[in-house]
Amino acid sequence: MSTHSNHPFHLVDYSPWPLTGAIGAMTTVSGMVKWFHQYDISLFVLGNIITILTVYQWWRDVSREGTYQGLHTYAVTIGLRWGMILFILSEVLFFVSFFWAFFHSSLSPAIELGASWPPMGIISFNPFQIPLLNTAILLASGVTVTWAHHSLMENNHSQTTQGLFFTVLLGIYFTILQAYEYIEAPFTIADSIYGSTFFMATGFHGIHVLIGTTFLLVCLLRHLNNHFSKNHHFGFEAAAWYWHFVDVVWLFLYITIYWWGG
């Protein structure tokens, strides 16, 4: 940020990452379309590699600006907070579309579905087995990330480390159970609107859990390198907000799709 002078505002240097990120996104989507049409997966893999490398180096630069260069002033931090809040709001609206599709189909099932929900021939999951365990796991992870945050505010380095470690562990455990549930599922994404809405909603939530787990893992590594203090730790706060958002979305998914809709 050489353009930064004696003022608090957020002016950034020229960066290649928006361009490489756009190239990575375009390559990933193009590769996905090819893959879905029975072509090879190489373009999709290349796009993912470009995107992951871009995200890593972009966030590395942001961490350097805030940790080593001292460029994240109060005004900049306020802007970052609003950016994260608006990002989470956009994610909320993203999931609203999935719930809308689900309720549109389930509250008045079409005659082609047997005028019933779940549709005729669909064997739904028992909400009191793996889904209930996953709910308990995510609720527990919400407790551990809050524990880590309060410990950080009290300058308790070891308890912050423990809280973040257990949160990441619970996130990985949730993902493993979700993958097992998908493998054992008695229906597929092609089995009527029920399969489509189920796998779209829970699948995108699963992707968000993976992103949140990665976010918290980065926070754990940064904490071990003393990047956070009790007064300056917005990276951790953003990860905690995102994780609580993931928790709340899962509660709605569990209550509506697994319990009521099953």
Curated annotation (Swiss-Prot):
Main location: mitochondrion
Pfam families xref list: COX3
Domain of life: Eukaryota
Gene Ontology MF annotations: cytochrome-c oxidase activity
Record keywords, A-Z: Membrane, Mitochondrion, Mitochondrion inner membrane, Translocase, Transmembrane, Transmembrane helix
Annotated compartments: Mitochondrion inner membrane
Gene3D superfamilies linked to this entry: 1.10.287.70, Cytochrome c oxidase, subunit III, four-helix bundle
Enzyme nomenclature, EC number: 7.1.1.9
InterPro entries: Cyt_c/ubiquinol_Oxase_su3, Cyt_c_oxase_su3_dom, Cyt_c_oxidase-like_su3, Cyt_c_oxidase_su3-like_sf, Cyt_c_oxidase_su3_a-hlx
Keyword Membrane listed: yes
Topology with respect to the bilayer: Multi-pass membrane protein
Gene Ontology CC terms, in alphabetical order: mitochondrial inner membrane; mitochondrion; respiratory chain complex IV
Membrane-spanning ranges: 39-59, 83-103, 120-140, 163-183, 198-218, 240-260
Catalytic reaction list: 4 Fe(II)-[cytochrome c] + O2 + 8 H(+)(in) = 4 Fe(III)-[cytochrome c] + 2 H2O + 4 H(+)(out)
Keyword Mitochondrion in record: yes
Family: Belongs to the cytochrome c oxidase subunit 3 family.
Biological role stated in the UniProt entry: Component of the cytochrome c oxidase, the last enzyme in the mitochondrial electron transport chain which drives oxidative phosphorylation. The respiratory chain contains 3 multisubunit complexes succinate dehydrogenase (complex II, CII), ubiquinol-cytochrome c oxidoreductase (cytochrome b-c1 complex, complex III, CIII) and cytochrome c oxidase (complex IV, CIV), that cooperate to transfer electrons derived from NADH and succinate to molecular oxygen, creating an electrochemical gradient over the inner membrane that drives transmembrane transport and the ATP synthase.
Name listed for the protein in its UniProt record: Cytochrome c oxidase subunit 3
The species this protein was found in: Drosophila melanogaster (Fruit fly)
